[in-house]
Amino acid sequence: MTMRHCWTAGPSSWWVLLLYVHVILARATSAPQTTATVLTGSSKDPCSSWSPAVPTKQYPALDVIWPEKEVPLNGTLTLSCTACSRFPYFSILYWLGNGSFIEHLPGRLKEGHTSREHRNTSTWLHRALVLEELSPTLRSTNFSCLFVDPGQVAQYHIILAQLWDGLKTAPSPSQETLSSHSPVSRSAGPGVA
């Protein structure tokens, strides 16, 4: 009697594959150091502009929320990232700092868990980044909220030092979106309403 072994991909295997594909895509493109506007405390509502007629133009939508007032050194700070996906079970939302995983950064900071909220034809993903003790190094770190699903990859960059310096100068924000349907598509981030 001959025994055959048939390998089937479990759910954890897909996450590893999806993360691997993301890392390849993220390293293949340059990530500009950009900031987001502090006047509203948020970039935009990630799911409000989605249209089923043109999903590749609007997905993924990504939003980052930060404190409107500068947090003093050694203070606690929470950044919140929200993404909207049409792939409820095949999407990842996570934070990076200077291109590295949060666990590799110096200082007291941690990622929250990813929560998922299913709404009609979309799924909202939420994930917080908590800086328990803001240091000069963390203040100058390029934090990136990354969102990956089978259709696209999106990154939102925020540097706290530039963000708070922007209270005086109001810089224009930007959001980088990489689509699997086009080589590199970049769109300007939300403006001040």
Swiss-Prot record:
Q: Does the keyword Nucleotide-binding apply?
A: no
- Determine the domain of life of the protein's source: Eukaryota
- Polar residues composition-biased segments: 172-185
Gene Ontology terms describing biological process: T-helper 1 type immune response
- Residues in the signal sequence: 1-28
Any Pfam family the entry gives: YLDV-IL18BP-like
Can the keyword Transmembrane helix be found in this entry's annotation? no
Q: In which compartments does the protein localize?
A: Secreted
One GO location term (cellular component): extracellular region
Q: What does this protein do?
A: Binds to IL-18 and inhibits its activity. Functions as an inhibitor of the early TH1 cytokine response.
Annotated PANTHER family = INTERLEUKIN-18-BINDING PROTEIN (PTHR14292:SF2)
**What protein name does the entry list?**
Interleukin-18-binding protein
